[in-house]
Amino acid sequence: MISRFFRHLFEALKSLKRNGWMTVAAVSSVMITLTLVAIFASVIFNTAKLATDIENNVRVVVYIRKDVEDNSQTIEKEGQTVTNNDYHKVYDSLKNMSTVKSVTFSSKEEQYEKLTEIMGDNWKIFEGDANPLYDAYIVEANAPNDVKTIAEDAKKIEGVSEVQDGGANTERLFKLASFIRVWGLGIAALLIFIAAFLISNTIRITIISRSREIQIMRLVGAKNSYIRGPFLLEGAFIGLLGAIAPSVLVFIVYQIVYQSVNKSLVGQNLSMISPDLFSPLMIALLFVIGVFIGSLGSGISMRRFLKI
């Protein structure tokens, strides 16, 4: 059994070397296909991740007027510290909504710190009294469909300056995620089929060039599995070689994209899939798909042209 495997392995490697240019063409087609598959997969998985993050973090930002101290129990008035009669009026109005999951206060100082982390030191000119930001309440909804209702009700609360719900952008992202999932997977499947077809043509030429040898093997009683073995291994090798370059690109490029794009997402409580998780899984998937494509292409040729 082991000796047969190594015999098939030797025949497959010898055939790849003998049909050098066709091997290069087949490997190149697999490489291009898997690169495109990796791109589509990266977009699909990360779009789905962002959509999930939004669904799990559906929120409305309610900005409080600058003349309202809703989160302080006392205020300074005419040089004296007095009780704040407006304490938590906005907070209580938001908290009492049946569609609200939680309400969290975010001071303008906290927002300023987050903004400088994202935008850089250019915003430091607004530090202290020059801070143009507003105190705000971060309101999490029970469900995505509740966002618009919460936003409309929050606008009616006295002391509220502005309300941001990101409704239109959120809906567009959900629609985009759905579109990419359906069409992205469809295009990836089409690319895999095309690569398998190209490999099948490469294997077919090999089969034709060795047709006399194959006929003799069949006449002397060689089993179908014995004849089929070297060709399946040859296809698998083509797929394996074609997966190397896309895997290297995934490892390098995804790391660069993650470091540059994820910074702008963190401030919105969103994130891409971590390279430590995504890259190993994607690389393993590319090698599996590569071997599958190669074996499938070889199998198609054997079935169509040898009638085995």
Swiss-Prot record:
Residues 46-178, 258-276 are cytoplasmic. It is a multi-pass membrane protein. Pfam families: FtsX, FtsX_ECD. The chain crosses the membrane at residues 25-45, 179-199, 237-257, 277-297. GO terms for biological process: cell division. The keyword Transmembrane helix applies. One of its GO terms (cellular component) is plasma membrane. It is found in: Cell membrane. Residues 1-24, 200-236, 298-308 are extracellular. Keywords: Cell cycle, Cell division, Cell membrane, Membrane, Transmembrane, Transmembrane helix. Interacts with FtsE. Interacts (via large extracellular loop) with PcsB (via N-terminal coiled coil domain). This interaction directs PcsB to equatorial and septal sites of dividing cells. Belongs to the ABC-4 integral membrane protein family. FtsX subfamily. Part of the ABC transporter FtsEX involved in asymmetric cellular division facilitating the initiation of sporulation. Required in maintaining normal growth and cellular morphology. This is Cell division protein FtsX. The gene is ftsX.
